[in-house]
């Protein structure tokens, strides 16, 4: 509650005094001065205030500017002023205002949103009139806001750690907040189907950052820094104690970006940043009851670095790039103005921009259409001969969720020459089908077989050249397109999609692919073979090993329940061994055997005397399972990836080295496979493998104390850990071969050298 005022010495290098401003403002997350008045975004007070602070440190003229109802977690965050506007950015705990405010976003955008409408958003107030606007929405918990000199607001949006490890997880990101845009996020629960936040109708990020806890963002060309840092956008990351410098370059009507580490400390739990009167950067740390400090960051010299001499061609390219961006930016501003006035006008120029190669122009054109009455432009979309214009225009129509449009959209959708589309158009084309399904499933059902065949024909592996394994567009990658295709095919009960999902998703090395495949086919009852059913439930059985956030086990439990309900009685009998198998079955197979001998390498010298071991490789594969090797190691498509992949181990090790590695696993252990020793403050020592969790911000640490038993997992409080160090001991137990005879060991080595 209240505020602190720090007065600096004339040198600006030391705090002279600290005063408590006793005012009833709870948790002020945003502060900005305007005309000698302080504007304060008091999160727990759920109100934006205006006040003055006199020389005696007393608050005066405290005025409520506007209340913002809702919760307080992802709440009322940062403030900034630019061009006569006060910008306020809020998280998804705050209710989106709908009274006494001009909403610049699309009126149909919530039609395509499943479930909750809770979303982070950017508001702005004209300081001269007090008029409020909803500038854009679809954020999660953006803490900071900064406006570039050209007028584009930027933020650093948080991820939803609950979704980590899933194909619908969205990492932290830098977002250019364009007028009327929707970044796509909505608060969602742990129910299926999940919400895939990034869709073609949403604004794409400028840059994905990854693991971090975003706090403030900052840019100020008046910083006494050399270029390029004077023009950089700075991101504050609380968790990793760092400040990133993002260098932005115009790309058409939007931006491209590259980030570098600017500053890092231990600790440096950065919360906010500002420019001081000396041009230096002032950074404050603290938060969540941690020590708070104020730092001054100054350049040794503000002189610009001497740029390398550019060739004539490079200079021409740079000049052309700037001119092109200015042209595209003018188009975007024209569209944004049309979107604001909402008056009847000649729409052909807007229609033309729907097919622009620039994603920001296409987005602005579609928003401009959506803000006009549909009757003014529905006919233009249906009559256009340009497939790209039709795609993006129909995306606007489909979001309105009017069932009368579904039949017309679907008829042309089936006639589209998708092979001629680029990746962005394929995402839009697929999204149209999904929206038609959501609006009126009965219309799509009448054309089910045609729709399924059309979708399967564009599965990436079947249409694109084999040499193309990954394409990237602002809408996503081919990997994500395949995942989305699987979801739509699953909704259509497409039996013929099972082999595609089995080959490309179930068998993928990507965890997200596996989950996407399991999610898509969880209700599918027909079209399975025993092999694909086994593959499905083997993956479900291994889901405890998946790395992710708190929500991942809950999602997987729900997928498993739905999948079990889809099994027939005959299928349950056919794969009973997989359904009934315990997670410790491999370990129990070893424990059930009697001791043969405590083998040493010298005892088995005759097996390893030749470079190629002759043995029964099929029986070796059986020994591989019985010795629990697959419990930690992958062999082809079988086993788990806890330890090194053994698929090609015969190319790396000769027979003697192979045998020694099995008999004495701690003889040489790579650092990433060592056990960890965790000493608690109580004196207890836990030795095991620390399970990598997607939610790295969890207060607990999970340790698997027995590498052969999945259920041997304990949780310890990170705050109670006294010391942590790596052990020289391998997680692979000694004596794994002591229950096998000489011939069985020979067969195992033969199998490892050359798998069946």
Role assignments for model-derived ranges:
Residues 668-672:
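Active-site phosphate-binding and catalytic loops of NTP-dependent enzymes
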Residues 243-246, 293, 406-407, 430, ...:
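Beta-strand-rich binding/interaction modules
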Residues 38, 595-596, 606, 663, ...:
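C-terminal capping alpha-helices of c-type cytochrome domains
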Residues 273, 294, 620, 624-636, ...:
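The canonical Cys-X-X-Cys-His
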Residues 286, 290, 299-623, 642, ...:
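Long, ordered, helix-rich scaffold segments
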């Amino acid at each position: 509650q209240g505020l602190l005022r720090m007065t600096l010495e004339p040198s600006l290098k030391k705090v002279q005094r600290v005063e408590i401003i006793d005012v009833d403002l709870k948790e002020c997350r945003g502060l900005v001065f305007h005309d000698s008045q302080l504007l304060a975004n008091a999160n727990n007070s759920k109100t934006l205030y205006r006040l003055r602070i006199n020389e005696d440190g007393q608050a005066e003229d405290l005025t409520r500017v506007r209340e913002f109802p809702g919760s307080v977690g992802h709440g009322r965050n940062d403030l900034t002023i630019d061009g006569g506007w006060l910008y306020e950015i809020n998280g998804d705990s705050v209710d989106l205002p709908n009274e006494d405010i001009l909403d610049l976003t699309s009126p149909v955008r919530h039609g395509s949103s499943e479930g909750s409408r809770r979303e982070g958003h950017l508001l702005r107030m004209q300081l001269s009139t007090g008029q409020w606007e909803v500038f854009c929405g679809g954020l999660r918990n953006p803490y900071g806001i900064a406006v570039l000199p050209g007028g584009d607001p930027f933020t650093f949006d948080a991820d939803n750690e609950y979704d980590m490890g899933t194909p619908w997880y969205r990492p932290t990101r830098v977002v250019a907040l364009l007028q009327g845009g929707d970044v796509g996020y909505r608060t969602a629960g742990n129910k299926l189907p999940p919400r895939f936040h990034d869709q073609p109708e949403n604004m794409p990020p400028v840059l994905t950052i990854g693991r971090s806890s975003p706090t403030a963002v900052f840019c100020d060309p008046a910083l006494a820094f050399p270029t390029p840092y004077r023009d950089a956008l700075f991101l504050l990351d609380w968790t990793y104690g760092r400040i990133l410098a993002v260098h932005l370059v115009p790309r058409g009507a939007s931006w491209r970006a590259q980030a570098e580490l600017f500053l890092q400390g231990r600790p440096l739990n950065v919360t906010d940043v500002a420019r001081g009167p000396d041009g230096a950067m002032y950074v404050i740390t603290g938060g969540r009851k941690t020590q708070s400090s104020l730092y001054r960051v100054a350049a040794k010299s503000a002189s610009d670095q001497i740029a390398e001499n550019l060739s004539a061609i490079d200079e021409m390219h740079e000049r052309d790039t700037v001119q092109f961006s200015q042209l595209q930016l003018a188009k975007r501003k024209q569209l944004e103005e049309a979107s604001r006035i909402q008056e009847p006008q000649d729409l052909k120029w807007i229609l033309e921009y729907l097919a622009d190669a620039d994603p920001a122009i296409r987005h602005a054109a579609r928003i401009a259409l959506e803000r006009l009455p549909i009757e003014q432009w529905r006919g233009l979309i249906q009559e256009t001969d340009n497939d790209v214009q039709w795609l993006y225009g129909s995306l606007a129509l489909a979001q309105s969720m009017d069932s009368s449009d579904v039949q017309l959209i679907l008829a042309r959708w089936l006639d589209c020459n998708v092979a001629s589309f680029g990746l962005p158009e394929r995402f839009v084309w697929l999204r149209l089908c999904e929206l038609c399904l959501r609006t009126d499933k009965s219309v799509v059902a009448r054309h089910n077989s045609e729709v399924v065949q059309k979708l399967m024909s564009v599965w990436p592996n079947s249409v694109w050249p084999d040499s193309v394994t990954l394409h990237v567009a602002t809408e996503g990658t081919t990997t994500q397109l395949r995942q989305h295709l699987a979801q739509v095919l699953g909704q259509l009960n497409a039996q013929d999609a099972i082999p595609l999902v089995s080959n490309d998703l179930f068998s993928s090395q990507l965890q997200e692919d596996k989950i996407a495949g399991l999610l898509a086919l969880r209700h599918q009852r027909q079209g399975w073979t025993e092999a694909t059913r086994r593959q499905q439930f083997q993956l479900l059985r291994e889901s405890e090993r998946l790395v992710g956030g708190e929500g991942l086990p809950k999602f997987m439990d729900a997928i498993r329940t739905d999948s079990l309900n889809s099994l027939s009685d005959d299928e349950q009998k056919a794969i009973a061994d997989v359904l009934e198998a315990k997670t410790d079955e491999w370990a129990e197979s070893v424990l059930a055997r009697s001791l043969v001998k405590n083998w040493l390498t010298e005892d088995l010298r005759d097996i390893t005397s030749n470079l190629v071991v002759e043995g029964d490789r099929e029986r070796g594969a059986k020994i591989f399972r019985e010795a629990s090797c697959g419990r930690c190691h992958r062999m082809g498509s079988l086993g788990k990836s806890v330890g090194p992949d053994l698929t090609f181990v015969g190319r790396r090790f000769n027979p003697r080295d192979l045998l020694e590695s099995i008999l004495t696993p701690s003889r040489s252990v790579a650092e990433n496979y060592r056990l960890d020793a965790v000493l608690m403050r109580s004196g207890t020592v836990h030795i095991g493998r620390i399970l990598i969790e997607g939610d790295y911000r969890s207060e607990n640490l999970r340790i698997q104390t027995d590498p052969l038993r999945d259920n041997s997992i304990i949780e310890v409080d990170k705050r109670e850990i006294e010391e942590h160090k790596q052990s020289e001991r391998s997680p692979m137990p000694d004596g794994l071969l002591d229950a096998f005879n000489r011939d069985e060991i020979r067969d195992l080595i033969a199998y490892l050298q050359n798998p069946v």
